[in-house]
Structure formats: structure tokens, C-alpha cells
């Protein structure tokens, strides 16, 4: 918990992982502004909880509460996933404003929960509550996906105003729930509540796909 700002910068991370029979612990972050920025990094820049292949436990939940801005940019991510029989953790975000912007980064930027190819556990739910404006730009995503035998988690997204704009990299930006061809699981539902303006441009999308 910080009274002002928290910044997670290039090649830095906050992580709680499961490697054995126990569960990973929860991550709880409270600050005025939170920025996860992969600019200049060569590796992962993220807040994550993962249940790895050799483990039997569950990944932990991630709770982020910012009274000001939450910015995930240029490869910055919030991630939960599972590679085993355990489940991925849920992600809860409460923010004054939200910016997900991959800029020129070709890798993942955004908020993700998934189960991977060899897993039988379920992906976690994603719940995002933004008091003001939210932007999902270039190839950034809010994504719930299943690649294994488990189910993808549900996605709930609320913001006063939302812009989804895939301009720039030729890759879609948006909010999605995906079931891969290799998966035996079911996709999660998507609920989007925007009482103000909802703008979707270029390769922007809100999609539930199998």
C-alpha cells in the first residue's frame, strides 16, 4: 500500500507463484496511481500470479485499487494463469481511470487470465470497475482465455466512458473471451457496462469466440 504512486518499470515484476502442492498467495495493491511500463525492457514487466506445471496448487488472486490512474503500457501486464490441475486466480481492479496501451510493443499488454495447453484447471474471472474514462489502445487487451481442458473465466468491465482503438500495429485491441481449438473447456461471459460514451475504432473489438 502506498499513499501516492507505485511504478513497476522495465523488467521488474510483482509475483506470487505456486511451484509445489501449496497455493500461491494473493496480491493486493492500493495506491493513488499505478503504472506498469515495459518501455526499454527485454523481459516481462508485470504483476502476476501463476500456478506452474510442476505444482498442484492454485494461483492467487490479484486485487488492485487505485484512486487515480491505472496505466499498463508498452508490455505492462496484470496476469493470472495456470499450467496444471489448479485454478488461475481472479483479478479485481478498481481505478479512477484506466489506460491500456501497447504503443510500439509487439508482445502482450493489458489484463489477462488463462489456463494453458496442458492444464485442467479453470481460468480466473476478471472484474474491472473504472469510475472515469477507460482506454484500450493498439494491441492491448482485457482477455480471458482457455487453451486447456478447464473453462475460461467471466469478464465484467464497467467504466463511465470507454474507447477501444486498435490503430497502429495491425492487431486487434479490446475485451475478449476465447476458447482455443485445442481446448475442451468453455469460454467465459463478457459483461460491459458503459453509461457514458462507448467508442470502438479500427481493429477494436468486444468478442466472445470459440
Feature annotation, model-predicted:
Residues 1-210:
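Extracellular and secretory-pathway beta-repeat/beta-biased strand scaffolds
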Amino acid at each position: 500500500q502506498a499513499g501516492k504512486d507505485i511504478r513497476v518499470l522495465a523488467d521488474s515484476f510483482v509475483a506470487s507463484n505456486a511451484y509445489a502442492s501449496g497455493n500461491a498467495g494473493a496480491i493486493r495493491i492500493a495506491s493513488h496511481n499505478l503504472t506498469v511500463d515495459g518501455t526499454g525492457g527485454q523481459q516481462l514487466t508485470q504483476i502476476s500470479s501463476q500456478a506452474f506445471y510442476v505444482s498442484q496448487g492454485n494461483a492467487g488472486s490479484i486485487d488492485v485499487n487505485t484512486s487515480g490512474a491505472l496505466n499498463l503500457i508498452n508490455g505492462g501486464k496484470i496476469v493470472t494463469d495456470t499450467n496444471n490441475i489448479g485454478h488461475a486466480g481472479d483479478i479485481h481492479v478498481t481505478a479512477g481511470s484506466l489506460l491500456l496501451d501497447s504503443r510500439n510493443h509487439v508482445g502482450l499488454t493489458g489484463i489477462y487470465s488463462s489456463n494453458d495447453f496442458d492444464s485442467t484447471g479453470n481460468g480466473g474471472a476478471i472484474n474491472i470497475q473504472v469510475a472515469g474514462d477507460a482506454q484500450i489502445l493498439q494491441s492491448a487487451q482485457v482477455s480471458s482465455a482457455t487453451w486447456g481442458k478447464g473453462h475460461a473465466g467471466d469478464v465484467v468491465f464497467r467504466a463511465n466512458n470507454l474507447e477501444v482503438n486498435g490503430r497502429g500495429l495491425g492487431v486487434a485491441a479490446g475485451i475478449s473471451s476465447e476458447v482455443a481449438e485445442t481446448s475442451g473447456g468453455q469460454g467465459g461471459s463478457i459483461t460491459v457496462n458503459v453509461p457514458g460514451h462507448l467508442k470502438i475504432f479500427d481493429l477494436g473489438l468486444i468478442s466472445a469466440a470459440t
